[in-house]
Amino acid sequence: MKDIITRHKSGEHIGICSVCSAHPLVIEAALRFDLSTNNKVLIEATSNQVNQFGGYTGMQPADFRDFVYNIARTVGFPAERIILGGDHLGPNCWQDEPAAVAMEKSIDLIKAYVAAGFSKIHLDASMSCADDPVPLDPGVVAERAARLCQAAEETASDEQKRHLTYVIGTEVPVPGGEASTIGSVHVTRAQDAAATLETHEAAFRKLGLDAALERVIAIVVQPGVEFDHTQIIHYQPQEAKALSAWIESTPMVYEAHSTDYQTRQAYRALVRDHFAILKVGPALTFALREAIFALAQMENELIAPESRSRVMEVIDEVMLNEPGYWKKYYRPTWSQAMVDIHFSLSDRIRYYWPHPRIRQSVEKLIANLTDAKLPLGLISQYMPVQFERLSLNELNAEPHALILDKIQDVLRAYRYGCSSETA
């Protein structure tokens, strides 16, 4: 990470896409995408996804590391080119508990991530706990972030500290996506970014963390990008002009969250304007979902009814029976909720892919279509972009390969934005 930031600050057009997903096919797609390059691949876990208690994936930080490295071994991707990051590390999961308790758990969380070898740490203490005022005073936010940083510094070995980096900042979207529709988005003011840096610097120095300050590479801000279930707010460079100019006076860059579904030209403009770390998550699993739905249509054309995976029916039944991950996000009317379940840009379906019934049905879908030779015309009908790559001999007509390539369509847009080459 430090090398990428140094190159960006020296004037090179370079950024990095942060892959925020725990889905094995997404991680495989990301690693295969850069297998033949020298690029680093940044893969991040969030605190509610992976923590010392297991998170919703059931994985602790060391488990997630092993999970990623096992996929890398299968792919043949060198582990030294993987950067592991932790996102929203702080009291996010424990906001309903008293601050003292939540912070103790947050410190243990940070220690677990650093001990597992994660080298990019987002120190996020912005959320109010049960006995805190709302909103939290910026000084308290910085003070808590400094305590989290201190835990990381005490845990990291000297060798780890050579690669350890921190991200600070509080203006982040709701982890996991917006719960309601959005009309507009507030672009962070330059003076607010400056105040964030100033309060954090003071809090770090108060704890004797001067050396750690040198490891702070980015500030999280809102450049004016967001999405909800049905709409996307696209980047408007002129709105972020002052914010973009201010960061040039620091050794840091910006980290932008919720950059999913922006155009490839927007990613290029964001990196040009020093939003050099671009986080993406739902757009990747949205592409995965599109691929699986397309394959389900192909299966209906090719496979006898009694032998089909019925993946769409299984997904619907599981999500309707277990609505915990989508109920408070989607529209209440049944017909509208079904559209949201299937097609919402916030992609709450991503939480259900590990469900045993859904996982088994997806495996059967892939097995069915691997055994059946996929006709080119059928691929053209449901996956036209992949059909074009098949015609260019860039892709095999296998369901697994088609899914990965569909996910990589998203990564291609980020590569265009983050690379000095525009091909």
From Swiss-Prot:
A Pfam family of this chain: GatZ_KbaZ-like
Keyword rRNA-binding: no
Keywords: Galactitol metabolism
InterPro entries per record: Aldolase_TIM, GatZ/KbaZ-like, GatZ_KbaZ_carbometab, TagBP_ald_GatZ
Pathway assigned in UniProt: Carbohydrate metabolism; D-tagatose 6-phosphate degradation; D-glyceraldehyde 3-phosphate and glycerone phosphate from D-tagatose 6-phosphate: step 2/2
Family annotation (Gene3D superfamilies): Aldolase class I, putative tagatose 6-phosphate kinase domain like
Top-level division of the source organism's lineage: Bacteria
One GO process term, biological-process aspect: galactitol metabolic process
GO CC, any one term: plasma membrane
Similarity comment: Belongs to the GatZ/KbaZ family. GatZ subfamily.
Protein's job: Component of the tagatose-1,6-bisphosphate aldolase GatYZ that is required for full activity and stability of the Y subunit. Could have a chaperone-like function for the proper and stable folding of GatY. When expressed alone, GatZ does not show any aldolase activity. Is involved in the catabolism of galactitol.
Quaternary structure and partners: Forms a complex with GatY.
Annotated NCBIfam families: agaZ_gatZ, PRK15052.1
Name of the protein in question: D-tagatose-1,6-bisphosphate aldolase subunit GatZ
